[in-house]
Amino acid sequence: VVGVLDAGLGDTVTPEDRVFWLDEYRRNYKGDVGRERLRTASINLRDRDSLHARLGSVTCPVLWMHGTADAVYSVANAEDGIRRFSQSADAQLKIVDGGQHFLSASDPQHVNPATVEFINKWR
């Protein structure tokens, strides 16, 4: 879990935030239930391409935020993914310069206001 967390947070997260998220991940993936949760998350990441075929049937608004420093998925993956929401009422891709995979941890100053604005637009 620590390796995945480090890759997702990148090097821009403060030491205090890194400790917070590491503690949260350890708590979340603790014991048998936590290991099952981690296994399911890993399978979902591995098999995510099978989801692409279903994205064309999504009709709700979609906000996809992606960091340019994401070590897991590239901006090109995000650009391809957002195009697949062909029936969405509003499919937006916002790129965050220098943002990591765990964008809400590395760049809350971008994620939080964009999310609030998007939700307010569609509620």
Report each predicted region and the residues it spans:
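Short beta-strand/loop motif that positions the catalytic acidic residue
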Residues: 58, 64-66, 70
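Catalytic active-site module of serine/aspartate enzymes centered on a nucleophile-bearing elbow/loop
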Residues: 88-123
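Short, conserved loop/helix-junction motifs that constitute active-site signature segments
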Residues: 55-59, 84-88
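Acidic catalytic loop of the alpha/beta-hydrolase fold
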Residues: 69-73, 101-102
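Conserved alpha/beta-hydrolase catalytic His-Asp/Glu region
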Residues: 1-56
